[in-house]
Amino acid sequence: MCRILGAVSAEPISIEHELLSAENPLIVQSEDHDSGWGMAVYRQADSEQPELVRFPEAAYSDGEFRRATSMRGRIFNAHLRRATLGGLTLVNTHPFVMGEYSFSHNGTVIRYPKLIEDGCAPPQGETDSEHMFNWLMCHFDSDHPRKSLRKLAEKCIRCSAFSGLNFLFSDGEKLYAYKLGIFELHWLVRPGQALVSSEIITPDEGWHTVQQDVLMVLDPNNPENPHAERLVGDELVAAAEIDKFEEGQHLRGDARGKFAAERAARVAAGSAE
């Protein structure tokens, strides 16, 4: 229900074109995805903590968004929110960051309280996405990031119905992009760059569609050769309970925020639909 845009580059760049002036830029997409926006930018891609900007307002009406488009880096993790769980607050706005790690998500995992475990960092907000990120960080093995992401996908599939598990994750060295569910994901390689996006931003370029259950690994030190692999396999994908969750689809702005906050409260109280 959200929009994600990621990029890696051999040299520091800005993605101002993709954010503002491309044929289908994020600022235009934000007219329908108006529950907030955020971006984590890694300037050097050497495992440093990213520079994070995020606001719980629509990007198209927020001057901070235009100012943020000039940020330069080698890894970008950008997100437009269309709230389904959790109100319009800063703590519910993606990407979520913990140290050098950043995470943004497109989809709804309706029984997300099942991701809460003793010993894991408590969420600051009410979103399913932050619960996913905190569970991942609780179980993360920095020596085996793809294995850790596989465990997250397996956990979500086994514990809840969902519309999408599409996510962007970065450890400050690489960008990982995963697709599973009803929402699309696309990728593009340019000289010295690679991008991944929920929507095709520049239709005149050679975008490719990411298939179900494919994890892409984009390396800023080798951006023109992204790696792709299946993550959980056919058996678990077949067992996944994928649902559109169409309630509240017509809502926008504050009305959507109120709906998402009330829905999260119901789920947290144990009355997940």
Where are these regions (language model features)?
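Short histidine
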Residues: 110-171
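Short acidic (Asp/Glu) patches
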Residues: 55-67, 78-99, 115-117
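Short, compositionally biased leader-like segments
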Residues: 8-10, 42-44, 49-78, 132-135, ...
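Conserved catalytic micro-motifs used in adenylation/nucleotidyl-transfer and phosphoryl/amide-
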Residues: 2, 92-110, 154-216
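Short helix/loop capping segments that flank catalytic or ligand/cofactor-binding pockets
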Residues: 15-16, 50-52, 86-88, 105, ...
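Extreme N-terminus nucleophile/cap motif
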Residues: 1-57, 177, 194, 213-215, ...
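Cytosolic regulatory regions built on CNB/CRP/Popeye-like sensor folds
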Residues: 48-56, 100, 111-121, 273
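A short, Trp-centered hydrophobic/proline-enriched beta-strand micro-motif
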Residues: 38, 75-79, 166
